[in-house]
């Protein structure tokens, strides 16, 4: 149908490395399982600190990060990420996910440096499509 968005079943993420930063184990596993189903290579971190420490090793194509994280939150994470040089990962596209589906949350996330925003519960088709679009502009 013209104008309809693709379903995740038709989106191929083979070769795309996604870093998920999410403290909730169930949410982290759900996102990872779905992205892997579409062919993505997935690395998972439970905190912003661990994600930043190992970013050079992971070299993801896209980051998916919760905004509500213990310690440094998702906004602090993206600001720290954007201060890095591009070769250190400072220009990696990043998607914020949040249970707080308010207009100001999405605006705040984009202003801080996120490339995209999805409200929880995350529509998995929207996630896969957004990841695909970010690596295939």
Q: Can you describe what each PLM-predicted range is?
A:
Residues 22:
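Conserved acidic carboxylate
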Residues 76, 100-118, 129:
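Alpha4 helix (beta4-alpha4-beta5 surface) of REC/receiver domains from two-component response regulators
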Residues 47, 73-79:
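Acidic catalytic/metal-coordinating carboxylates
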Residues 58-64, 69:
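Active-site beta3 strand of CheY-like receiver
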Residues 1-19, 125-137:
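Non-catalytic signal-transmission and effector/linker regions of two-component phosphorelay proteins
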Residues 29-37:
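Charged docking surfaces used in two-component/phosphorelay signaling
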Residues 39-46, 54:
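Short hydrophobic/Thr-rich beta-strand motif most characteristic of the beta2 strand and flanking loop
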């Amino acid at each position: 149908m013209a104008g309809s968005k693709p379903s995740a079943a038709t989106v191929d993420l083979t070769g795309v490395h996604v870093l998920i930063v999410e403290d909730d184990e169930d949410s982290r596993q759900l996102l990872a399982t779905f992205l892997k189903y579409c062919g993505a290579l997935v690395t998972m971190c439970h905190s912003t600190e661990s994600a930043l420490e190992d970013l050079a090793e992971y070299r993801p194509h896209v980051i998916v990060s919760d905004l509500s994280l213990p310690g440094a939150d998702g906004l602090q994470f993206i600001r720290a990420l954007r201060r890095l040089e591009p070769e250190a990962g400072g220009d990696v596209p990043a998607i914020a996910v949040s249970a707080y589906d308010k207009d100001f949350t999405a605006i705040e996330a984009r202003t801080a440096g996120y490339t995209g925003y999805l409200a929880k519960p995350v529509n998995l088709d929207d996630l896969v499509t957004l990841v695909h679009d970010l690596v295939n502009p």
